[in-house]
Amino acid sequence: MSEIPGDLKFLKSHEWARVEGNGRVTVGISDHAQGLLGDLVYVELPEVGADAKAGEQIAVVESVKAASDVYSPISGKVVEVNSALSDKPETINEDAYGEGWMFVVELTNAEEVNELLDPDAYAEALENDDH
């Protein structure tokens, strides 16, 4: 498993959130998740302007093996999407925590970030996972 960046927060469902410091949060799926899914062939991103609600499905990633819902780790308005993923969904496989980001949300409740798992807690959740 690759190194988990220390500046990220996570959901147990393998989404990550990076607080950008300007009230915005970049979201993607973890390296662990892309590894389980295998080669991604399709990404369905939210629309810019869509309302994101913490813990609710907002996007879909599809691989040759399975389709998987992506849940928003925080609530807010989607202000940017990584449209490059439409043509190159495999970018998530190649760089899950960098170029493979999925969308950016403008936070409505900064407290929600504190409810997410830190990298150590996420690593522990992975160890206890039955996968």
UniProtKB/Swiss-Prot annotation:
Binds 1 lipoyl cofactor covalently. The keyword Ion transport does not apply. GO terms for biological process: glycine decarboxylation via glycine cleavage system. Its cofactor is (R)-lipoate. Residues 24-106 form the Lipoyl-binding domain. Belongs to the GcvH family. PANTHER family: GLYCINE CLEAVAGE SYSTEM H PROTEIN (PTHR11715), GLYCINE CLEAVAGE SYSTEM H PROTEIN-RELATED (PTHR11715:SF3). GO terms for cellular component: cytosol; glycine cleavage complex. This is Glycine cleavage system H protein. The gene is gcvH. PROSITE patterns: BIOTINYL_LIPOYL. The glycine cleavage system catalyzes the degradation of glycine. The H protein shuttles the methylamine group of glycine from the P protein to the T protein. Keywords: Lipoyl. Pfam families: GCV_H. The modification N6-lipoyllysine is found at residue 65. The glycine cleavage system is composed of four proteins: P, T, L and H.
